[in-house]
Design a protein with these regions (language model features):
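Generic helix-packing signal
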Residues: 26-28, 44
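Short, charged, surface-exposed hinge/linker loops at domain edges
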Residues: 1-8, 38, 42-79
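ATP-dependent carboxylate activation and anion-phosphoryl transfer catalytic cores
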Residues: 2-5, 20, 28
Length: 79
């Protein structure tokens, strides 16, 4: 398991953009997009790992991952 594995990964279809959008709420929004859901997920995982490395390189603390009830509460704020 990598440090990036702890973060939520969201892949959703965008009618406006006519493609899948991948994001990681704790680190960034709208990180990648494409027509193949699996490829977007794989790219999102790579971007998350790169972001984690950038945080470490810059000496910044990583944001806390959202999990369990926290995730549900955060998603309800958006809905």
């Amino acid at each position: 398991m990598t440090a990036g594995s702890r973060y939520v990964k969201i892949i959703e279809w965008s009618d406006a953009d006519n493609c899948f959008i991948g994001s990681c709420p704790e680190l960034f929004y709208g990180g990648c997009h494409g027509s193949n859901e699996r490829e977007v997920f794989d790219e999102l995982c790579e971007i998350i790992d790169e972001m984690v490395e950038l945080y470490k390189k810059d000496g910044k603390p990583l944001p806390s991952p959202i999990s369990g009830k926290e995730l549900v509460n955060e998603l309800q704020k958006v809905a």
